[in-house]
Amino acid sequence: MKSLILCFLLTLCVMLTLVPSVALAAEERYGVWILDEEITSSRKISRKEGWEFDPNTYTLTLRNFQIGTIGTKISALFDKYSLFGLIYVDTSVHDLTIRVEGRENYLGDEAFPYENCTKYKEAYYGIYATNTNLTITGNRGAILKIQTHENAIECKNLTIKDSVTVEAVSQGTCIYSGGDITIEGVGTIVNARTTDIIKGQATMSARGKLYVGEGALDHMFRG
């Protein structure tokens, strides 16, 4: 009997040594979705697609990243069409930095600001992060272009800095913050424009304060 137990234990030990250590570790989820998939400990970089995530600093780096209509569905009591976020951030994420590198970073499609939804009854947000303090930064001269049906950027508090350029166009409110909007740093440029399909919408709206630092520029256009 003892020999059978010993044999069983030895067999079990051998089996455990054959199991990869990765399989034993639980996959960590970070609450940020890109290209319709959540960023996890096993999926936090794609050199081919041009993005990388650092979980230690909660920084998502975009390197000439381009995305059109691959988004994460947003739960909403809305029956006219389905809503999606091209970059979607869960409400559990309180702080996120998006670092932009290169001049060819695009979210959305040039047709989106001139229509209510696509022919498939889908409407897109650019960066959807309603409970998140969002910072957009990058190297000098980096450009992020966002063209969407719904808000190009929606977040809690928004900071754009460090000489990046953000160009955003949507059919309604282009940039919406549930708190403050801060634009700072010499050479930082924000071009926000609404096509005004939804009448009376602001290009940039904050429930808190709007601060534009010395040397930074914000341009807000309608139509």
Regions flagged by a language model, labelled:
Residues 1-10:
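Positively charged n-region of N-terminal signal peptides that target proteins for export
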Residues 9-13, 204:
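Intrinsic structural disorder/low-complexity segments
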Residues 4-5, 18, 174:
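Intrinsic disorder/low-complexity segments
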Residues 24-223:
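A composition-driven surface/loop motif
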Residues 14-23:
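C-terminal segment of classical bacterial N-terminal signal peptides
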